Amino acid sequence: MTAIALAVAAIPEGLPAIATAILAIGAYRMAKKNALVRKLSAVETLGSVNVICTDKTGTITKGEMTLKQISFIDSSYMIEEDKTKISVVPSDGNPNEGNLEFLLSIIPPHVGDDAQIVNDNGRTILKGSPTEGAVLYAVYKLKGPGWIDERKRQYPVVKVYPFDRFRKMKSSVHIIDGKYLVITSGAPDVILSRSTRVLTRDGEVVIDKDTWNKLRLLIDELGSKGYRTFGVAYRWMSNFSDEYSDEEVENELVFMAVLGIIDPPREGVAEAIKIARKAGIKVVMVTGDHKSTATAIAKMIGLDVDNGLVIEGRELDKMSEDELQKIIDKVVVFARATPEHKLRIVKAFKARGYRVAMTGDGVNDAPALKMADIGVAMGIKGTEVAKEASQIVLLDDNFSTIVEAIKEGRVIYENLKKPINFLLSCNLGEVATIFGAELLKMPIPLKPLHLLWVNVVTDVAPATVLGLEAPEPDIMDRPPRPVSDRLITKRKLIYYIAMGSIIGAALLLLYNVLLKEGLEIARTTVFTSLVIAEIGLVLTMRSETKHFWELPRNRWLLPGLAIAILLQLIVIYTPLREVFDTVFLDARHWALSLIVPIAIILVDALRKSLKIKL
């Protein structure tokens, strides 16, 4: 009987179900906060994340692009919009209506089907490319749908060379009066590198060194305002063949204008970054945007650009893995980055010992999402491939949700430790009681059925309640959990062995005193005292450092403890007592049963007052 009792006492039978329930409840709470957990293990991993690599567009920013500025080399226009109309207002230089009109005319045929303006029950909706959509929408508001349709007829499309992330540009070829007009748009610096002339108010001018510098300054100036920059160029060709490659078409361009498109930061992102920084989490922005644009947005949201590095993709391409790892700690922004760069960035951070969360939405982001400790896909604009490669999907595509998910991950990890520690102490107390009684040659104080009842039934409600604790106020003031952190450390194990020994000693003392009143009375009182001891353990396990009266209220605590007591009353005061070999207890026996929980609370209060860490 003793051997069976020891075997039952040593195994916390309810632990797997409780741990799974806590993780599932945590995943449910995260889903309510727009973070959908695809893999349950990610819930626990989140608490140790110490670097977030995040996209800019749609995650840091709203993803709502609006054309704000059109800049030629010698003139600039601001786009002003109110509730009823949109207007183009000259801001500096010498306005040239002819150049502006030409630019507006070629935008609709060039955009083509890559962006569309549709009417949905009275609402104007943009579909397709958000960047081209922002430009097309401005033209739509300025000129109207009829004008746009007329321009498309005026510039019929012969061929389109679609945008790709390697060329960073798109070109369309149109036939007009027997000649071919090539319209190219994309990254201004790349388009400038393919241009030999620039459009001015006096016509086309060859780009010399001074002109080149002036155009570079113009691009950087718009980027420094936080605008996403969009370059437009063109060229005329007397002959064209459908077999021409993009390289044959996209050269000797006439640089036309730089367009500034604003995509403002989301509300709450700056505050979320402050919280992340306070929590010891490094935030790195990874974007395909121009360096000046990325830097400006980074400053707006509070990233420490002045004391960190902003690295462009072309600089990254020149670095070896060792060189990247040496500077990765200092990087705040990666600009002009590609999905391949994302993968290298994740590898570099992991090589430095970081736990990395990486966001992504495209098919090509999948390798980086898989490589990251936590892959975070976008729920709104993300592809199915990205979602499948991720552990978490953001239902609102919002950066702030990542920080909230990390907070929830920390809470869940802390709450996962509490029932484990609780059950460990309970079971060690049971083992100490059975083993001590055997050493002292006393009759076995707890039968295997009693121990099973405690482990499988009455322990479950209090342990689950511990897993539902509210976050401690300073949860995001602590550094991330080290990767080497363990649920049970040597110090904790020693403490819980000591706590189990105290429980065992107190129960044996009580048992010895009551044996003279009869074996059934002594066993029933010890059995009940063990269940009530859970009250003391639950109260002490709510926090490793704070007294239970200093913690936020847990609305599930009293119901959980009440369920455990009610279940114990059932096996004492109903016919089930014959199954469990229990007898009625009077008020004195119930009072004696309180000795163990009081001892537990006093010992733990002393430890916390002396600030002895586990």
Q: Can you say where each PLM-predicted feature lies in the sequence?
A:
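Generic alpha-helical transmembrane segments
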Residues: 458, 502-504, 524-538
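The cytoplasmic-loop to transmembrane-helix boundary for the fourth helix
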Residues: 480-496
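Alpha-helical transmembrane segments of multi-pass integral membrane proteins
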Residues: 494-508
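A C-terminal functional module that forms or caps the active site or interfaces directly
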Residues: 541
